[in-house]
Amino acid sequence: MFSFGIILLTVVSFTNAQWRQDMFTTAENQLRSIVQNGQTLLDFIYQERQKHGGGNMTGGSLMSHNVAYSSFINDVETRLADMEQATQELVRIMRTCPDAPLAPPPPTNVIVESTTIDNVSSIVVKWDPPFNPPENMQYKVYFVPVDQNGMQTAGEVVFRICDSTQTIASITDLTPRSRYRIRVGAVAGAVAEGASMPLNVKTPDIIPSRVRNVMVKSSTANTIT
């Protein structure tokens, strides 16, 4: 069990709702496929139009006694109308979508120190604010236990610091001779974040407590009692 000191904090779960590069790639591939399929359909429609260019047209529609073919034509018309409406709606949404906040630069000069007193270890994290920080900026301190190979051994815990002027924090009630990975993030808005590079730290070995109430009753040249 461990605790976080110096300021009031909240343990939070973190979900990044920003665009990722793989999301851009997926959207681009989907749109290219839609455009390609649309061109293929346009070619089919052109070919059908050429076939029936001299056919019996009444009110702009082909008079056909083939029920299956008539059903096919109606199905194409309905699906194309649905596709047109869906793409128009998506364009409208994208045009009115609010811009995502830009991630602030990460905190700088992050320093991690550890101590062990009375068989209890603690870690103190210090940092400098990012250059030109945005308004209403907050910090997050990420903390996770690791093994000697740097592999994560438990879930990552995130502490939120709501006061942007607070640039020092402590994590207490840790185990001596244990390894941890720490990083600090500067957060703007709901999810936009710039995080520092992670730092590994090992808590010191047990340091015996100071002996108290030492009394000297008598002494000679060679003995002390």
UniProtKB/Swiss-Prot annotation:
CDD domains according to UniProt: FN3
UniProt signal peptide: 1-17
SUPFAM superfamilies for the chain: Fibronectin type III (SSF49265)
InterPro entries assigned to the protein according to its UniProt record, in alphabetical order: FN3_dom, FN3_sf, Ig-like_fold
Expression by tissue: Component of the organic matrix of calcified shell layers like nacre and prisms.
Keywords on record: Secreted, Signal
The Fibronectin type-III domain, residue ranges: 106-206
Entry's localization field: Secreted
GO CC annotations, alphabetized: extracellular region
Protein name: Fibronectin type III domain-containing protein
Annotated source species: Mytilus californianus (California mussel)
